[in-house]
Amino acid sequence: MLIHDMKNGDRFEGYYILQNIAQRTTAAGKPFLTLNLGDRSGTVTAQVWDYTGPIGPGDVGKVAWISGLASEYRGAPQATVYRIRLAEENDDFRVSDLVATAPIEMDKTWDWLVDTVASLEDGDYRAVCQEMLGTYGKQLRLIPAAKSVHHGFVGGLLMHTAYMMRAADFYAGLYPAVDRSLLLAGTLLHDFCKCEEFVTSPLGLVAEYSLKGQLLGHLVLGAEAVSRMADKLHIPEEKSVLLQHMILSHHGEPEFGAAVRPMCIESELLSYLDLIDSRMEIYTENMEETPVGTFSGKIFALDKRIYNHA
């Protein structure tokens, strides 16, 4: 049974992804496990009462066979797990039932991205981008763009990057003052080092943040990677610094995670393109869960509800 289809009182069994596992103790001193179960339709919080193992926090991102009961707590769906074991090699389940995938044609999107990079007029920016694609391309094609807020599915980063580059190419043609090569290069590279920020599960989902991801973040990691690549290719220092600035400033303001504020026309534009694409995906994902003619629940990332009109 898909999580999205579970209703209060339903008994269920099947294969689910284990997320956010924590071992806890009741007030009476009895051990239990709290975790999130996930599949391609959503997630639900669950408890395994009187449980001492073997499953624990080290199994985040793995698949388990589970039987249990769907219920509610204070109006929110949850589940009680009666039986749980890690999936085995010969178990019959489809990864496509468990993992949400970007609604794009992966190969065609990747080919478009490569062709667009080849079209950059500036040879220095083009060289950096092509080398970075060679280094990080495999991860770019697979990983999500975020753990949960937006594009949190396999191929999400590729989709996010490609959509932003299409918009960037349009705006570069609209405003003559914008350096197309710099804008598209910065757009391509802005989230590249999320592959170092995240620890991904064997299924390609974000299990947690890496040590470097927590202490440095993908902006700093990305700027460092570009700096190293620019040095390797003997790119002029100012161009290297401009690319690093694009990455470090793409969150717009320090309160939103930017290391510095945008200080050139291309970095200003990039920060808005990133905001627009992430917001549009947040709206899209939540509208799919909100019946026509009704309001959603409060969306943490937007700090408001949204209305899904006919």
Per-range role (PLM):
Residues 1-12:
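OB-fold nucleic-acid-binding modules
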Residues 125-168, 192-197:
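A short mid-domain helix/strand-loop element embedded in enzyme catalytic domains
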Residues 78-144, 221:
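Extended, charge-rich, solvent-exposed interface segments
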